């Protein structure tokens, strides 16, 4: 499923997005963010992060730099170090 979602995002980025003007208010763009989020966090969490990002991408949001959050490590593994 992850590969299918990433392929759909790639198709959008290279086939559909060039036909429209650049409307994303964020860096990286929403499609780049979605690709990175799903690649990093998996389909479920990455998909949720992508949907939240798309919800923030509107004319009343100032936008700006909004990177994909890093993977959270468990407390027990960081305490063992």
UniProtKB/Swiss-Prot annotation:
What keywords does the record list, in alphabetical order? Cell inner membrane, Cell membrane, Membrane
The keyword Transport is annotated on this UniProt entry: no
Outline the segment boundaries, as ranges, of region: Disordered. Answer: 59-81
Query: Where is the protein situated, by its record's location annotation?
Result: Cell inner membrane
Bilayer topology annotation: Peripheral membrane protein
Q: Which domain of life is it from?
A: Bacteria
| Phylogenetic placement of the source organism | Bacteria, Pseudomonadati, Pseudomonadota, Gammaproteobacteria, Pseudomonadales
Q: Which species is listed as the source? A: Azotobacter vinelandii (strain DJ / ATCC BAA-1303)
Q: Which InterPro entries match?
A: Membr_insert_effic_factor_YidD
Indicate what this protein is called per its UniProt record: Putative membrane protein insertion efficiency factor
The record's comment on protein family reads: Belongs to the UPF0161 family.
Q: Write out the transmembrane intervals.
A: none
The record's Gene Ontology cellular component field reads: plasma membrane
Principal location class: membrane
């Amino acid at each position: 499923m992850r590969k299918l979602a990433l392929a759909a995002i790639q198709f959008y980025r290279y086939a559909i997005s060039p036909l429209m003007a650049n409307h994303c208010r964020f860096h990286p763009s929403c499609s780049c963010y979605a690709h990175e989020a799903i690649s990093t966090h998996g389909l479920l969490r990455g998909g949720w992060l992508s949907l939240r990002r798309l919800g923030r991408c509107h004319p009343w949001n100032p936008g700006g730099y909004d990177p994909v959050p890093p993977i959270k490590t468990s407390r027990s593994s960081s305490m063992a170090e």
